[in-house]
């Protein structure tokens, strides 16, 4: 149904979860699904195989996007390119923080880990929520003071995601902690 709609109404931008997009491509006339300008993936790890499939069949720009609800959904993003350092990642990197957000890869003591080392992904900045509605214990567990910020009262959101910073500064999602 969606694919038939797209064949009659071409679109410029599509934002979708990779597994959903794969299922659509497998069951539909492929050309109808391709947006004319941008294809944004988010919600789960994006494989290089899917990126290559898109590049073979479409001329649109591929963007990978990461962001939990606790950071107003959008937090990190990248235009998927062929940077040699990035291609060393197992999955397509989730990118760099958008304006007014910071991303930290920290160890169990909340200290930064070296480039390439795995650690937990923490997000800070203007997009971080205040906490969970009427759940003070859960809020205290996930929303922490930011020891790396220059402004007093800054907080971090502990995502529970395992990640590493690549040599080019982008971040690769590795799974859940």
Regions found by a protein language model. Name each.
Residues 61-64, 79-177:
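AMP-dependent adenylate-forming
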Residues 1-93, 100-112:
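Adenylate-forming
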């Amino acid at each position: 149904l969606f694919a038939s709609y797209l064949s009659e109404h071409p679109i410029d931008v599509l934002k979708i979860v990779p597994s959903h997009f794969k299922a659509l491509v497998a069951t539909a006339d492929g050309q109808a699904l391709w947006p004319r300008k941008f294809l944004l993936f988010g919600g789960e790890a994006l494989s290089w195989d899917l990126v290559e499939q898109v590049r073979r069949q479409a001329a649109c720009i591929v963007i990978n996007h990461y962001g939990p609800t606790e950071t107003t959904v959008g937090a990190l993003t990248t235009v998927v390119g062929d940077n040699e350092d990035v291609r060393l990642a197992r999955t397509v990197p989730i990118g760099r923080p958008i304006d007014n957000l910071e991303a930290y890869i920290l160890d169990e003591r909340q200290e930064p880990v070296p480039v390439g080392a795995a650690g937990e992904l923490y997000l800070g900045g203007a997009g971080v929520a205040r906490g969970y509605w009427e759940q003070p214990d859960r809020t205290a567990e996930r929303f922490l003071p930011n020891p790396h910020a220059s402004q007093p009262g800054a907080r971090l959101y502990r995502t529970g995601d395992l990640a590493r910073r690549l040599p080019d500064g982008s971040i690769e999602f590795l799974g859940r902690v």
